[in-house]
A protein has these predicted regions:
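Hydrophobic/aromatic-lined pockets within catalytic cores
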Residues: 54, 80, 84, 123-127
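Compositionally biased, intrinsically disordered low-complexity segments
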Residues: 7, 14-16, 48, 52, ...
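Intrinsically disordered, low-complexity peptide-like regions
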Residues: 1-7, 76, 121
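Histidine-centered nuclease catalytic patch
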Residues: 66-117, 130
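Hydrophobic beta-strand residues in large extracellular and virion-surface proteins
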Residues: 49, 61, 76, 115-117, ...
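Short, charged surface segments at domain edges that flank catalytic/cofactor-binding sites
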Residues: 13-65, 96-109, 113
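C-terminal/domain-terminus segments
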Residues: 2-13, 127-144
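Cys/His-rich metal-chelating microdomains
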Residues: 60, 64-72, 121-125
Length: 144
């Protein structure tokens, strides 16, 4: 069981995974531990993950998120971002202070199910956004 810092974050994630067996069956996509540590660990395996995903899925952008998607696998991305300030902005309506960004929270994991191939455009467009249930369903069902 995950211990979300805020109950409303758990409430936010529940409907995203409803069609995928529920939140509990998808805990492997989430890791609430320190984002910097997760990023350092990912950087050590990034190239290997990229090769394995290309071998398994081919040279395809699994996100198809940007209107001008090139549909080529150029990068590895996290489906659920390692960290994001989206919920702090939208749910808690936090504002940035004097040139500082709204604080980010740690969410995504380095589990293989959370890795996707993407083109540069889609990866750049998605940034730290948490995908909606339609994109989650498409990618996790490997229907791209």
């Amino acid at each position: 069981m995950l211990n979300f810092e805020h109950k409303e974050d758990e409430i936010f994630f529940e409907p995203l995974f409803k069609e995928l067996g529920g939140l509990e069956k998808n805990y492997d996509l989430l890791d609430l531990s320190d984002a910097l540590s997760k990023r350092e660990a990912f950087n050590k395996i990034r190239n290997q993950v990229f090769r394995e995903l290309k071998k398994q899925f081919g040279d395809v952008c699994m996100l198809n998120y940007h209107a001008d998607c090139t549909n080529t696998a150029e990068q590895v991305d996290h489906l659920i971002p390692l960290s994001s300030n989206i919920l702090n902005k939208t749910i808690r309506v936090m504002k940035s202070e004097r040139g500082r960004k709204v604080p980010a929270q740690s969410f995504g994991s380095n589990n293989s199910r959370n890795f996707v191939l993407s083109c540069v455009r889609c990866n750049s467009a998605k940034k730290h956004h948490i995908p909606d249930n339609k994109l989650l369903n498409k990618v996790l069902s490997r229907n791209f």
